[in-house]
């Protein structure tokens, strides 16, 4: 166990000393690897997130996350226990000490699962979805009151304990502080929210957004809980916007004009009536739930409900209790930002670039949309910053095929292919988003030196080239079809390469062969070969010893039936099979049986009626064979056990001439004269002729089997012996 633990620690570089044991990987967070481990001090399982500090940018993100999660304390937020350095060392409160470390460990609360795993099993009941949505809004109300944006809300970052149905928000690796008194335009990172949960404003202005982006993501998550599938699952940002416009109405004219300047091919004169409203995307939900969702998924962030307003909606009235929905008592402000601390130089801080509003009462919705460029110059870069890395999901930017990289983007050394990216953060005119693009280029499946989405695009002739030009639309359509064909071909090749179909067929054949061998092993008697052998033997001369054995066997059977304490030598199943074959034997000689009665009091019945039971089943299963002779014939027992009482002999004498009667136990005692069915009288060893065959039958469900000619009885005995 110790060797396995040390190996796992060495592979993933976990260095926490001997305090934490039983490491198990959980996944990757926004900026680190997450493991679960058992804390030996308290014997409790915790989640540990490792953040590698390789450059100033990673240090800044780590410090930002640590500052945020240390201050956030809420029932619906994953709790953080402590922050550790290498070898499990305790970190000081001096945030500048992070610059001297190569890694940091965040020990936090362990949760059973996440919402993404739950939704893989299918949609939730509306009541469960409403309960989880209430807890999500309750946590968002606290987070936003602390002037924090999560910026990466998705089902995988919402953790759940299934026992008490408690939901908690986690993974603040992409969260940041945003003081509403300051304009953060141009200083916000781009494309951080997972593509399927990005709001329309985030798609149009990726570096100018507000807390409303978290509310849009929450609405998409609520719809996903109700349907079990992603609400807007676009392959790239252009398709993502198209899917949104098909279901979300555009009410304000200024929003429609902005869209008209970006993607006019999708814009109509009247955008208030979408083609596929939410009622079609979410059939079966209640009217209150639909109204609640429509007020969250609005195109304009100014019309969107805040977390506090959503909690006051009538749909949440059964859970909402404002006195139990706390807000942060110590919110973050502009001085809590970390850029100046990390860069260790006041000249490198971006605080001096921020503009202080004269009226600090402005809300987040009152920020100007555009500041440095006209609205007509807005371009939409159809990049898909997907979390997956498969070749099928890689999105191609049509502009990459144009000549001259430097003609497409700003003349800035940060985007020069020959320019080293490492020292770029030292320049005073460096923008943090450019370095972020360079750093995460390998994860977003795109060119490593793409510029900002909208405001940093400069085209060759300094003219606005909208995304509705024919060549670009055709390129995007062709790419989509080709990627679909490639996906189909690749899926087939993988299936053939992995041998899934062949393996499945081989497994089925092996199962069938094993079942066949098992049947051959368990079957007690092959009736086909037996019949063939008996027919061949029937033509041979009957030896004397066989006749003697038949007489002895007949006598033994008649005496065994009179001994009530002797257990039956065959199972109930063989008795049923014997009854069926006897019924067929009687049917063969129907003429001699038609007038025979069974004397059994009130329970008597015609024996020909008894033999016709399940006759229809004989037609359906005429090829079914059973070994019924085990019932009619058994070996002779020890003479000491065959003694009978005189009373029973008397009864037997009284009924000796009867062909059949019912005893008290419901069994049918059969006594058939051999001469009536054409079997010759054999002589017993004592010289007395054998004139009858006796057997015991139990009325029950019978199965049919082929008839055997009476001439083969002696050969059958030979086979049994």
Swiss-Prot record:
GO BP term (any one): protein phosphorylation
Biased composition (Polar residues): 701-715
Record's keyword annotation contains Plastid: no
Domain notes: In contrast to classical MAPKs, the TXY motif within the activation loop is replaced by the SEG motif, whose phosphorylation activates the MAP kinases.
Residues bearing PTM Phosphoserine: 189, 386, 452, 556, 558, 665, 684
SUBUNIT field: Heterodimer with ERK4/MAPK4. Interacts with (via FRIEDE motif) MAPKAPK5. Interacts with UBE3A; this interaction may be indirect and mediated by HERC2, possibly via HERC2 interaction with NEURL4.
PANTHER family registered for this protein in UniProt: MITOGEN-ACTIVATED PROTEIN KINASE
UniProt-listed InterPro entries: Kinase-like_dom_sf (IPR011009), MAP_kinase (IPR050117), MAPK_ERK3/4 (IPR008350), Prot_kinase_dom (IPR000719), Protein_kinase_ATP_BS (IPR017441), Ser/Thr_kinase_AS (IPR008271)
Gene3D superfamilies in alphabetical order: Phosphorylase Kinase, domain 1, Transferase(Phosphotransferase) domain 1
Keyword Glycoprotein among UniProt keywords: no
Post-translational modification: Phosphorylated at Ser-189 by PAK1, PAK2 and PAK3 resulting in catalytic activation. Phosphorylated by MAPKAPK5 at other sites.
Residues of the active site: 152 (proton acceptor)
UniProt short sequence motif FRIEDE motif, positions renumbered to this chain: 332-337
Domain (Protein kinase): residue spans on this chain: 20-316
Protein name (Swiss-Prot/TrEMBL): Mitogen-activated protein kinase 6
Cross-link (Peptide (Met-Gly) (interchain with G-Cter in ubiquitin)): 1
Pfam families (alphabetical): Pkinase
Function: Atypical MAPK protein. Phosphorylates microtubule-associated protein 2 (MAP2) and MAPKAPK5. The precise role of the complex formed with MAPKAPK5 is still unclear, but the complex follows a complex set of phosphorylation events: upon interaction with atypical MAPKAPK5, ERK3/MAPK6 is phosphorylated at Ser-189 and then mediates phosphorylation and activation of MAPKAPK5, which in turn phosphorylates ERK3/MAPK6. May promote entry in the cell cycle.
EC number annotated for this UniProt entry: 2.7.11.24
Cellular component GO terms held in the UniProt record: cytoplasm; cytosol; nucleus; protein-containing complex; septin cytoskeleton
Record region (Disordered): 701-721
Catalytic activity, as annotated: L-seryl-[protein] + ATP = O-phospho-L-seryl-[protein] + ADP + H(+); L-threonyl-[protein] + ATP = O-phospho-L-threonyl-[protein] + ADP + H(+)
Highest taxon in the source lineage: Eukaryota
Motif SEG motif, residue range(s) on this chain: 189-191
Cellular localisation: Cytoplasm; Nucleus
């Amino acid at each position: 166990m110790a060797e396995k633990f040390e190996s796992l620690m060495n592979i993933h570089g976990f260095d926490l000393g001997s305090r934490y044991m039983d490491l198990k990987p959980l996944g990757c967070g926004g900026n680190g690897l997450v493991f679960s481990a058992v804390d030996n001090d308290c014997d409790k399982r915790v989640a540990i997130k490792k953040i590698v500090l390789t450059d100033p940018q990673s240090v800044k993100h780590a410090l930002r996350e640590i500052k945020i999660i240390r201050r956030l304390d809420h029932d619906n937020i994953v709790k953080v226990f402590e922050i550790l350095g290498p070898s499990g060392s305790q970190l000081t409160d001096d945030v500048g000490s992070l610059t001297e470390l190569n890694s940091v460990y965040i020990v936090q609360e362990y949760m059973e699962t996440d919402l993404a795993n739950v939704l893989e099993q299918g949609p939730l009941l509306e009541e469960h979805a409403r309960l989880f949505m209430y807890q999500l809004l309750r946590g968002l109300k606290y987070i936003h009151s602390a002037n924090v944006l999560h910026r990466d809300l998705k089902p995988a970052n919402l953790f759940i304990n299934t026992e008490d149905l408690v939901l908690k928000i986690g993974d603040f690796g992409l969260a940041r502080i945003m003081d509403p008194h300051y304009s953060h335009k141009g200083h916000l990172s781009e494309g951080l929210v997972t593509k399927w949960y990005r709001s329309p404003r985030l798609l149009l202005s990726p570096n100018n957004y507000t807390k409303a982006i978290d509310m849009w993501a929450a609405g998409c998550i609520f719809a996903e809980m109700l349907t079990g599938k992603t609400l807007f699952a676009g392959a790239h940002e252009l398709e993502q916007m198209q899917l949104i416009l098909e279901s979300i109405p555009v009410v304000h004219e200024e929003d429609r004009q902005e869209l008209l300047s970006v993607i006019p091919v999708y814009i109509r004169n009247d955008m208030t009536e979408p083609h596929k409203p939410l009622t079609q995307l979410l059939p079966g939900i209640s009217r209150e739930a639909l109204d609640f969702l429509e007020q969250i998924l609005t195109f304009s962030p100014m019309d969107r409900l805040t977390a506090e307003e959503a909690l006051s909606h009538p749909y949440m009235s059964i859970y909402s209790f404002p006195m139990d929905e706390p807000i942060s008592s110590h919110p973050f402000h502009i001085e809590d930002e970390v850029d100046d601390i990390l860069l260790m130089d006041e000249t490198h801080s971006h605080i001096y670039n921020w503009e202080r509003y004269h009226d600090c009462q402005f809300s987040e919705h009152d920020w100007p949309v555009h500041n440095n460029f006209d609205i007509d110059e807005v371009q939409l870069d159809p990049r898909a910053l997907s979390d997956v890395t498969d070749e099928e999901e890689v999105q191609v930017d049509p502009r990459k095929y144009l000549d001259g990289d430097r003609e497409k983007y700003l003349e800035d050394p940060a985007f020069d292919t020959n320019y080293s990216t490492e020292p770029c953060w030292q320049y005073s005119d460096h923008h943090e988003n450019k370095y972020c693009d360079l750093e995460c280029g390998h994860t977003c499946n795109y060119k490593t030196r793409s510029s900002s989405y909208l405001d940093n695009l400069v085209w060759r002739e300094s003219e606005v080239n909208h995304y509705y030009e024919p060549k670009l639309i055709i390129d995007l359509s062709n790419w989509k079809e080709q990627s679909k064909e490639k996906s189909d071909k690749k899926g087939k090749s993988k299936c053939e390469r992995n041998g899934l179909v062949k393996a499945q067929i081989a497994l089925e054949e092996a199962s069938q062969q094993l079942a066949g061998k098992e049947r051959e092993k368990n079957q007690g008697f092959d009736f086909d070969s037996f019949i063939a052998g008996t027919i061949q033997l029937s033509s041979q001369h009957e030896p004397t010893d066989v006749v003697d054995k038949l007489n002895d066997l007949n006598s033994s059977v008649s005496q065994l039936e009179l001994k009530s304490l002797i257990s039956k030598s065959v199972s109930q199943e063989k008795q049923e099979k014997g009854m069926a074959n006897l019924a067929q034997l009687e049917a063969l000689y129907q003429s001699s049986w038609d007038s025979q009665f069974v004397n059994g009091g009130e329970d008597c019945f015609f024996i020909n009626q008894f033999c016709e039971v399940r006759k229809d089943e004989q037609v359906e299963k005429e090829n079914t064979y059973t070994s019924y002779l085990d019932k009619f014939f058994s070996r002779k027992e020890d003479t000491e056990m065959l003694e009978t009482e005189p009373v029973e002999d008397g009864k037997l004498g009284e009924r000796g001439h009867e062909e059949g009667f019912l005893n008290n136990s419901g069994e049918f005692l059969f006594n058939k004269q051999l001469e009536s069915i054409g079997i010759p009288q054999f002589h017993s060893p004592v010289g007395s002729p054998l004139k009858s065959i006796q057997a015991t039958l139990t009325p029950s469900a019978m199965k049919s089997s082929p008839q055997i000619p009476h001439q083969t009885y002696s050969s059958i005995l030979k086979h049994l012996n």
